[in-house]
Amino acid sequence: MEAFVVRGGRKLEGTIRVDGAKNAALPILAASVLTEETVVLQGVPMISDVRKMTDILTMLGCRIRRDGHTLTLDAGGLNRTEMPDALSKQIRSSIFLLGPILSRFRQATVTYPGGCEIGLRPIDLHLSGLRSLGVVIHEEGGVIHCDGGNMHSGEVHLDYPSVGATENILMAAVLLPGISVIHNAAREPEIVDLANFINAMGGSVRGAGSAVMTIEGVKRLHGVQWTPMPDRIVAGTLLAAGAITGGTIELTRAPVQALLAVNAKLREMGCDVREEEKRVILTAPERLTAFAQLQTQPYPGFPTDMQVQMLALLSVSEGTGVVVENVFENRFTHAGDLNRMGARILCSGRTAVVRGVPELYGARVTARDLRGGAALTLAGLKAQGETQVDGAELIDRGYEHFETQLTCLGADIRRVHANA
């Protein structure tokens, strides 16, 4: 097990470039198998989830060459439709391959995917959407067998605007003759990026970013060179690091439009946030002011992936604030660790009430998922003394060299091997 050891008390200051988005890169990697031609992806974050996804693609027969943050993929030799069990269980994004493989080969087999333990994230919406496109699905012993021999275009009505289901159905439909429509589609910017990527390969997707997406099937897709969008959650986390330490942070290559909900909350807490073209500049007060309430929502609402970071900020703010988690039911698991550091957080169901305290104190805490681990690291930046965040490898799932980024901004943080 690895851990971050953080000594708090330093204001973070400086300029940092935002990495490519994990939640854009993973579905785009999956969509790369829709063509037999070469795809070049630039600016790909070299995080553990991306490495595992490329391992899965390689085992399926895809040839991949890595040069720094550039991946060159050739899926022309893809020859397997059954995804490797062990790797699929480690990474939830393996489910993204279901749609593209069905589209290419009209059959696919996948085990139930893994990922962070942040509550139930059923894939029933993925499967019901694929059934609407004519896929016959048989589930047995945690294995999903899909027969797409009679796949056809169609109308898909999602009960909830699921990001993953929207992306999977989009990728499954792109090579089907006729017109498919996704109703109640998710609107996240990463979906827009995926649709733009597919269109750049010769696809015909309209309405991405709205509640109704239309996919007109094409016969084939060609190769392309593409750069995934910058990561709005990494950007928000870095801004939160500046805010909790009373510092000044400038982000370059920032996804400004995608950060509006986060920036609005930071302003409520007393931060000065300036938004320019591809830049965000935050200047934080000595002590933050608690916002009255935050509710997570699908985009363009406040992102659930930034909720626990804001919980850390709220814990040292002046006043009392309420956080309501509407997306996942198990996302306050790190409140106990923050309380161990001196926070005053009371959780009940999907609601957390936070009474701000003047100081946090270093402690040994444990990351249980990647966003919670990042939030505990932020708390350590503010705390008096030394904080050890066990489970740094979980943070690596979504942040590339997180400790290096924070060190560049002035943090005292190092990675160590830790005993359980």
Locate the predicted segments by residue.
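Short, structured segments at the rim of ligand-binding sites
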Residues: 1-420
